[in-house]
Every structure is written in C-alpha cells, then in structure tokens.
Amino acid sequence: RAVRFVRSHAQEYGIDEADIAVMGFSAGGILSGEMLLHYDGQTDGTALDPEYVPDALDQISADAAACGMIYSFYGRLSVGITDVELLRSGDLPPTFYCYGTRDPFYDQFLANASAAEEAGVEVERLQLDGMPHGFGARGDWIPVYDEWLAGIFER
C-alpha cells in the first residue's frame, strides 16, 4: 500500500508517478523483495485477510520502477532465492545490489544476484571490500546508487 499511496499523491509531492522505487536494508530489503515478487499485482488485501475492505487505493498500481537491495536479497531471512523461474515470474524491476565482502550473507548475495540476472532482471552490483553486514551509509555507495537510480528514472 505504501507504493500505491505515494503514487496516488505523486502530483502533490511533485514527483513522476512512474519514478517510484523500493529499497531496503537487510530484512527491509527482503520485505521489499517479497512485495515485488508476490504482492505488487494484487488488487486488494482480501487474499491476505478475508475481512479486508477494499478501497480506492487498491485500484492504483503498486509496481516499482527499481529496487535497491542494500545488504539484502530476494528471499527469506538468511536465504536468498536461487530459483530462476520464481524470479522470472516476479517480473522484477531493475535491481541494485550493494553488499560487503565481510558480510556473513556474502555468498547469498552473489547467488541471488546471479539467479536474478539469469531470470532476465537488469542487475547492478556494488561490492564493498572489507565491509560487514549493517554498514549503513559508510562505503561511498550512496552516490553510486543515486546515479544508477537517476539513470533508471530517465528512461
């Protein structure tokens, strides 16, 4: 609903409704990925809660133009998805992966990004040598992500 809410207020916020991306760090990235893989095309919440009452927001697209996975991946906690067909079925947007080489999930990032590429997802990777999990704003990745995202939005 967050993407739908932002899209419904795009004019008020002074943004192009096509220029909405999702991004998450660690488990937040997994949550963003779950939304993109399984729920962005859902028209309302009744599949999750039979007592849900649909409203006008449910008619607005929840598609995202891009996804930022910052020390994260498409999957569930601690396990990145490597099922190429599942990733292909998600019709995923261009995805930016940023991860450190000292992260305990390093191999998961590599495997998930490779599977996403094989599934036809446009992938950009930024590896930060020596960085652990949870590096936050350290590592000079933000300008790289910003430039990548601006390029996506210019299309």
Question: Where are the regions that the model predicts?
Answer:
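C-terminal catalytic histidine-bearing segment of alpha/beta-hydrolase fold enzymes
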Residues: 98, 110-155
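Primarily recognizes the serine-hydrolase "nucleophile elbow" in alpha/beta-hydrolase
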Residues: 1-90
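Hydrophobic anchor at the start of a short beta-strand
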Residues: 20, 95, 123
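Conserved strand-to-loop "acid loop" that flanks and positions the catalytic carboxylate
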Residues: 72, 96-103
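Conserved alpha/beta-hydrolase "acid-adjacent" motif
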Residues: 79, 104-110
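Glycine-/small-residue-rich active-site loops that bind phosphorylated ligands and cofactors
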Residues: 103-104, 133
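Surface-exposed loop/turn and secondary-structure junction residues enriched for glycine/proline
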Residues: 16-18, 90, 108, 131, ...
